[in-house]
C-alpha cells in the first residue's frame, strides 16, 4: 500500500562535513510540488549531459528528502547510510560511488532501475522488486545477491564482488549479464532465452549450462 505524501521520504547520512556541498537530482511524481530537503540548503542548479542537478550546502550530516520521489540521483556524496523504505513511489535510484554498506529496497515495489556501483554493500535482496529492469551493483562486497523469482530484468551488472553463487532462474527476459571477477562456481543459463551478452570471466566456474 502506498503511503501518503506526508510520510513519503528518503533519508541518508553523509561523511561530508557541515558546510560542504552535495549534488543531487530529485524527480517527483507530482510535478507541481517540489520535494522538501531538510539538512541541506539549495545553492544553485548545474547541468550535466542535458540534465539539471541541484547543488546543496549541508547544514546537517543527515539529509531528509520529503515528497513523492520517483527518481533520486545521489552519486559521489560520501553517503554512509541510506533509507529508501518510506519511498513507495521510487522507480529509480542512482547511488554510485558512496560508502553505503546496506540498501533495503523491500518496500520499493515500483523500482525499475537500481545503480549502486562502488559502495560497500555485502547483501542485496531484490525479491520484492519484480518490476526491476536495470541492475548495476559492480565493485561492492556482495556475497549474496537475490533476484526476484519472476522479473522484467533486462540488464544485470554485478562484477567485482564476492559472489560464490548466482541464481538467475526465472530471468527469462535477461539480455545482458556481466558477473566477472567473482567466485562463482556454477552458472545455469537455461531459462535465459533472451540472453545476448555474457561476461563471466575471472570466476571459478566448473559448470556452465
Give residue ranges: language-model regions.
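Short, intrinsically disordered, charge-balanced linker/junction segments flanking boundaries
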Residues: 200, 206-209
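Conserved hydrophobic beta-strand positions in leucine-rich repeat
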Residues: 72-74, 91-95, 112-116, 133-137, ...
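Consensus "Asn ladder" position of solenoid repeat domains
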Residues: 77, 95-98, 116-119, 140, ...
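N-terminal capping/linker segments that flank leucine-rich repeat
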Residues: 1-92, 109, 151
Amino acid at each position: 500500500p502506498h503511503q501518503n505524501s506526508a510520510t513519503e521520504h528518503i533519508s541518508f547520512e553523509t561523511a561530508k562535513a557541515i558546510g560542504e556541498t552535495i549534488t543531487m537530482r530529485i524527480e517527483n511524481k507530482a510535478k507541481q510540488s517540489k520535494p522538501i530537503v531538510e539538512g541541506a540548503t539549495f545553492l544553485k542548479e548545474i547541468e550535466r549531459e542535458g540534465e539539471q542537478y541541484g547543488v546543496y550546502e549541508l547544514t546537517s550530516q543527515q539529509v531528509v528528502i520529503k515528497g513523492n520521489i520517483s527518481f533520486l540521483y545521489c552519486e559521489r556524496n560520501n553517503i554512509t547510510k541510506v533509507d529508501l523504505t518510506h519511498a513507495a513511489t521510487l522507480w529509480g535510484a542512482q547511488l554510485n560511488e558512496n560508502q553505503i554498506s546496506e540498501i533495503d529496497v523491500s518496500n520499493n515495489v515500483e523500482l525499475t532501475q537500481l545503480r549502486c556501483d562502488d559502495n560497500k554493500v555485502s547483501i542485496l535482496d531484490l525479491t520484492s522488486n519484480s518490476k526491476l529492469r536495470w541492475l548495476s551493483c559492480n565493485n561492492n562486497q556482495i556475497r549474496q545477491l537475490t533476484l526476484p523469482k519472476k522479473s522484467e530484468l533486462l540488464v544485470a551488472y554485478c562484477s567485482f564482488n564476492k559472489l560464490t553463487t548466482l541464481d538467475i532462474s526465472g530471468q527469462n527476459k535477461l539480455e545482458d549479464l556481466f558477473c566477472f571477477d567473482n567466485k562463482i562456481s556454477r552458472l545455469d543459463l537455461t531459462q535465459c532465452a533472451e540472453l545476448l551478452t555474457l561476461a563471466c570471466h575471472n570466476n571459478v566456474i566448473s559448470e556452465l549450462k
